[in-house]
């Protein structure tokens, strides 16, 4: 089966994102196809490279990046939701008084059109 995952929860404070990550790992271990992960609403905070968990806590942002590197899973971040929550890529800074963006590597800003395309080609979409 071909899956798209929609993450709407932040990396910390709820279990949405960590459960989504564990589900993605399970999908890949059982040889399903994970087309993409789309971060929306507070889920865009998973792409904030300024998030710094305690040293003894699981670093979910690094885990998502590892999933991208190891399995080439696309990590899409809703552009509008990201801007509302202060997640900005370096290329968007020319209109703002900010020196450096905080969009983590491996994540890419996109619109809802990417989510729609993913839904169209996948067998299942699951929201966390």
Swiss-Prot record:
It is an enzyme of class 2 (transferase). The active site is at 78 (cysteine persulfide intermediate). GO terms for biological process: tRNA wobble position uridine thiolation. Keywords: Cytoplasm, Transferase, tRNA processing. Gene3D superfamilies: DsrEFH-like. GO terms for cellular component: sulfurtransferase complex. Its EC number is 2.8.1.-. Belongs to the DsrE/TusD family. Part of a sulfur-relay system required for 2-thiolation of 5-methylaminomethyl-2-thiouridine (mnm(5)s(2)U) at tRNA wobble positions. Accepts sulfur from TusA and transfers it in turn to TusE. PANTHER family: PROTEIN YCHN, SULFURTRANSFERASE TUSD. This is Sulfurtransferase TusD.
């Amino acid at each position: 089966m071909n899956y798209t995952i929609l993450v709407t929860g932040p990396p910390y404070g709820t279990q949405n994102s960590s459960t989504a990550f564990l589900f993605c790992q399970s999908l890949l271990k059982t040889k399903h196809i994970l087309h993409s992960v789309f971060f929306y609403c507070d889920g865009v905070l998973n792409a904030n490279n300024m998030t710094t968990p305690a040293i003894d806590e699981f670093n979910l942002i690094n885990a998502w990046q590892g999933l991208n590197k190891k399995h080439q899973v696309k990590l899409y971040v809703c552009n509008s939701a990201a801007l509302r929550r202060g997640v900005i890529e370096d290329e968007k800074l020319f209109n703002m008084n900010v020196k450096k963006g905080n969009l983590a590597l491996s994540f890419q800003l996109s619109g809802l059109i990417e989510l729609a395309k993913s839904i169209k080609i996948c067998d299942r979409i699951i929201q966390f």
